[in-house]
């Protein structure tokens, strides 16, 4: 029903609540213990109605008569948490001018803290006749109530007890990229009702697993409220990854263990509190580059119907269409002050109210586009830099998008760290035996100073990874040359075709013991390389137990056993898990692998005989320019001087660690290595050997001794005398 008379009824429905003017800010629905303030920004609106939905789905419409600076608002006493609501925005529907107001659509609150229900795809969600030839024709005005989700007023009060962020320094951080459902859906020790939920991720068995891997931060794939788009649903698939968000303040409701409206908020907070108690930070993968509304043929859920030109980048020559730097149909307009405010308010909310510790920005280059080009001095970066809250948490960029000039690895500002795609590519190429990779490999192993030093950043700015959610798992990287994405319903056209992978001789599953042994060794090689590299390592969930997606490198739509972690692999691949734990423990125990400053390649103190780092040939002498120029060399020994760490510790004290020698052999045959002269060390002891299933080695050698490094393996030696 609809009425302009607060507190009265027209006889066809319940009496409308009392309405007070309220405040323009904060935006969204804010409960204060006595009532709720509602506010919505729309510059194009001519009229806005707040719609309250009762338990039976009956709607009461309340005009928002107060407008300050294009913010429509009201305060309703006695409106309490659990109240479902939405907005109807009256204004021009003129696609040629970029305007798409449609009051037949119940619009979700851009600042909604929780959402309830689900979407039913059909004419009701679209502001054009889906059967018409011209999608710009007058909309059919089919009401979306009952076919769309509803926003929910939440209770903001929560007992955080003594919660504190671990605030782990970057150089001590080990990131574990995880999916809330995929991580927990099949774990036998998690109660069935908690599997696939925030509560499941906070279960002691998951926390113990992370602690045993020495993980200090989980990077959660999108948990902002997202949509399962109609194309996937028609194929019997789902938007598993979650990169199709529309609720930047709300934890995805399907990851809550109960379906009670608003329950996801408290459950998410409880998860964060539990992880913090275990010393684990929570980083969110956030998608502020686009929304779930898609292109001009997409549904009208919220932003499109509220103020299309404010929230989206439209084509200059034809405002009916959307600029798409993301491959999803639209791009958020981060140049508009209210859209920038939305993003910054969202980031602050998750830090202040939800206690998260950082963000990984999906396709971050899109946020930096001012006109068309990526600009590292864009308004978005300026706002982040000066924000007293957001600037103090971990900020990680995925430094590319699909637009021209979008690949920006190494070009983000000083506060930021970056997914180092060049590290991933180089490590993969080196271990699969590609020629002319040794020099590049050396740069990536030592923190990628060529990418980050010029902007005043340190090795930790490089988020090093070999695998992530997007692409092959580590097991598949050594088992498949080609993608096998037929299950995605796109005739294997989707996903990256150039994976820098090597199947070790047979495509996919095999019983050949030699191939299986080689694959296992290659996985250990990349694990160990990641853990001895300068920078911040990131692990993809399940790689520690050899998770496989059977060659599918794009499981964005596979909410099934294909993408979930198979916890039975803990027993089947126990050796790999033991090796992974050993490698991460080695890194944790030795600061020489996590230096705060780049190597200088020189002696650090007068009188020192050796440099802070030295590159040696298998014969034990230092590498020359000619050695680096030999394209087919795949062997190198790296001396890391633990007594030449220049950055002091947190108390200003000198940092001293053991020295190490890393012997890399990516050839397909064993190679004899000669230990360097006694100026480096008189005696060395083996610490980690990728040729052994669990990394064990019983080896002690002295200066100038000769020993063999097996084909395609890495040997880590520690100076003991």
Curated annotation (Swiss-Prot):
Catalytic activity, EC: 3.2.1.-
GO biological process: glycogen catabolic process
The keyword Hydrolase appears for this protein: yes
SMART domains named in the record: Aamy
Enzyme class, UniProt record, top EC level: hydrolase
Residues forming the catalytic site: 362 (nucleophile), 398 (proton donor)
Source domain of life: Bacteria
Keywords from the named record: Glycosidase, Hydrolase
Annotated site, Transition state stabilizer, chain positions: 470
GO molecular function: glycogen debranching enzyme activity; hydrolase activity, hydrolyzing O-glycosyl compounds
Oxidoreductase found in the keyword field: no
Entries under InterPro entries matching the protein: GlgX_Isoamylase_N_E_set, Glyco_hydro_13_cat_dom, Glyco_hydro_13_N, Glyco_hydro_b, Glycogen_debranch_GlgX, Glycoside_hydrolase_SF, Ig-like_fold, Ig_E-set
UniProt family annotation: Belongs to the glycosyl hydrolase 13 family.
Name recorded for this polypeptide: Glycogen operon protein GlgX homolog
Taxonomic source organism: Mycobacterium tuberculosis (strain CDC 1551 / Oshkosh)
């Amino acid at each position: 029903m609809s009425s302009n008379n607060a507190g009265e009824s027209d006889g066809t429905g319940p009496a409308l609540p009392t309405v007070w003017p309220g405040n323009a800010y904060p935006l969204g629905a804010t409960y204060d213990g006595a009532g709720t303030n509602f506010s919505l920004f729309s510059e194009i609106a001519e009229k806005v109605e707040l719609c309250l939905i009762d338990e039976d789905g009956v709607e009461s419409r309340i005009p928002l008569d107060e407008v300050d600076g294009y913010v429509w608002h009201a305060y309703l006493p006695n409106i309490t948490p659990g109240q479902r609501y939405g907005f109807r925005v009256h204004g021009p529907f003129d696609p040629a001018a970029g305007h798409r107001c449609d009051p037949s659509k119940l619009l979700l609150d851009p600042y909604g803290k929780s959402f309830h229900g689900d979407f039913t795809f059909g004419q009701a969600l679209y502001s054009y006749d889906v059967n018409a030839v011209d999608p710009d024709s007058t909309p059919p005005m089919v009401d979306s109530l009952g076919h769309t989700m509803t926003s929910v007023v939440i209770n903001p009060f929560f007992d955080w007890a003594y919660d504190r962020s671990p605030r782990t320094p970057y150089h001590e951080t080990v990131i574990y990229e995880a999916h809330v459902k995929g991580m927990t859906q099949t774990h036998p020790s998690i109660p069935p009702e908690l599997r696939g939920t925030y509560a499941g991720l906070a279960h002691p068995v998951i926390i113990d697993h992370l602690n045993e891997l020495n993980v200090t931060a989980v990077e959660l794939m999108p948990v902002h409220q997202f949509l399962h788009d109609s194309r996937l649903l028609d194929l019997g698939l789902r938007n598993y990854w979650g990169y199709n968000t529309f609720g930047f303040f709300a934890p995805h409701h399907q990851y809550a263990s109960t379906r009670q409206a608003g329950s996801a908020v408290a459950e998410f907070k409880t998860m964060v509190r539990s992880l913090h108690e275990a010393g684990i930070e929570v980083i969110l993968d956030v998608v502020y580059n686009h929304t779930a509304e898609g292109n001009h043929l997409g549904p009208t859920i919220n932003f499109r119907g509220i103020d299309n030109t404010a929230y989206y980048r439209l084509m200059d020559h034809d405002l009916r269409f959307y600029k798409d730097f993301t491959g999803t149909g639209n791009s958020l307009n981060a140049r508009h002050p209210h859209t920038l405010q939305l993003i910054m308010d969202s980031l602050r909310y998750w830090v202040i109210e939800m206690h998260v510790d950082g963000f990984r920005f999906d396709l971050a280059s899109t946020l930096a586009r001012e006109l068309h080009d990526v600009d590292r001095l864009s308004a978005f970066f300026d706002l982040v830099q000066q924000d007293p809250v957001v600037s103090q948490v971990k900020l990680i960029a995925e430094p590319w998008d699909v637009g021209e000039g979008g690949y920006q690895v190494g070009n983000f500002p000083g506060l930021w760290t970056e997914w180092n795609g060049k590290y991933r590519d180089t490590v993969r190429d080196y271990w699969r035996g590609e020629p002319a990779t040794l020099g590049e490999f050396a740069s990536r192993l030592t923190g990628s100073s060529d990418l980050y030093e010029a902007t005043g950043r340190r090795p930790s700015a490089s988020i090093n990874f070999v695998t992530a959610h997007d692409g092959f798992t580590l097991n598949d990287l050594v088992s498949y040359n080609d993608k096998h994405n037929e299950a995605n319903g796109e005739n294997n056209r989707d996903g990256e075709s150039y994976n820098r992978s090597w199947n070790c001789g047979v495509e996919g599953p095999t019983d050949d013991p030699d191939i299986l042994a080689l694959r296992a060794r290659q996985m250990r090689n990349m694990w160990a390389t990641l853990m001895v590299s300068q920078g911040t390592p990131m692990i993809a969930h399940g790689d520690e137990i050899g998770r496989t997606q059977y060659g599918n490198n794009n499981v964005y739509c596979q909410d099934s056993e294909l993408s979930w972690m198979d916890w039975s692999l803990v027993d089947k691949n126990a050796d790999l898990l033991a090796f992974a734990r050993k490698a991460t423990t080695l890194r944790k125990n030795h600061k020489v692998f996590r230096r705060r400053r780049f190597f200088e390649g020189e002696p650090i103190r007068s009188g020192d005989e050796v440099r802070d780092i030295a590159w040696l040939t298998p014969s034990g002498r230092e590498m020359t320019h000619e050695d680096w120029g030999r394209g087919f060399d795949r062997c190198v020994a790296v001396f890391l001087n633990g007594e030449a760490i220049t950055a002091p510790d947190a108390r200003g004290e000198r940092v001293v660690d053991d020295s190490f020698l890393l012997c890399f052999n990516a050839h397909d045959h064993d190679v004899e290595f000669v230990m360097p002269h006694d100026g480096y060390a008189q005696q060395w002891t083996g610490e980690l050997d990728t040729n052994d299933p669990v990394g064990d080695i019983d080896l002690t050698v002295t200066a100038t001794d000769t020993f063999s490094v097996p084909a395609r393996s890495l040997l880590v030696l520690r100076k003991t005398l």
